[in-house]
């Protein structure tokens, strides 16, 4: 593993650890998501405690900056790192999101971040999984975004 790999993996964890929903909740509504609703610091809890419009920048940030960007930086056009490093960057970004060291290792569920990771790794897989998730969500009696398969 070379120095570029180590730097991008560390960068991925730092980016993943930024608690975007928590920050928006504090700035817009002065709410602490770790003490409201489901107590996770993700988009769904932010939406439940504010509104969808407050969640849109968080969805964008989590999907594209936390999920897509670290893997894009590993691509052939930037650092030309192998697929294992790409997957590792995605994993540490997701770990950073789910257990942010900025919030004493509390975080969200990582759904938007994972979608960004899948989109960056394989667009075809993204399309297939999106269809499966949409069908599962439509037919599930539970409408929580993370629990449709239970």
Can you describe what each PLM-predicted range is?
Residues 1-8, 67-88, 119-126:
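Helix-coil boundary and interhelical linker segments in multi-pass alpha-helical membrane proteins
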Residues 2-28:
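N-terminal signal-anchor transmembrane alpha helix
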Residues 6-11, 56-60, 86-91, 115, ...:
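Hydrophobic alpha-helical transmembrane segments
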Residues 22-55, 107:
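Cytosolic, membrane-interface loops and tails of multi-pass inner-membrane proteins
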Residues 31-40, 102-115, 142-150:
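Short, non-helical or kinked segments that cap or interrupt transmembrane helices
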Residues 47-51, 74, 92, 111-142:
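Interfacial segments of multi-pass membrane proteins
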Residues 48-75, 89:
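Multi-pass membrane catalytic core of lipid/isoprenoid biosynthesis enzymes
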């Amino acid at each position: 593993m070379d120095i570029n790999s180590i730097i991008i993996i560390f960068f991925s964890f730092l980016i993943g650890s930024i608690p975007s929903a928590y920050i928006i909740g504090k700035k817009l509504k002065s709410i602490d998501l770790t003490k409201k609703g489901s107590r996770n610091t993700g988009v769904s809890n932010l939406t439940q405690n504010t509104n969808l419009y407050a969640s849109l920048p968080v969805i964008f940030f989590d999907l594209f900056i936390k999920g897509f960007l670290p893997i894009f930086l590993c691509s052939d056009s930037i650092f030309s790192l192998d697929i294992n490093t790409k997957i590792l960057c995605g994993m540490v970004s997701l770990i950073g999101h789910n257990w942010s060291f900025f919030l004493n290792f509390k975080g969200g569920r990582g759904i938007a971040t994972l979608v960004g990771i899948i989109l960056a790794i394989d667009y075809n897989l993204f399309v297939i999984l999106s269809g499966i998730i949409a069908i599962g969500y439509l037919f599930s009696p539970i409408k929580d975004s993370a629990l449709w398969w239970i």
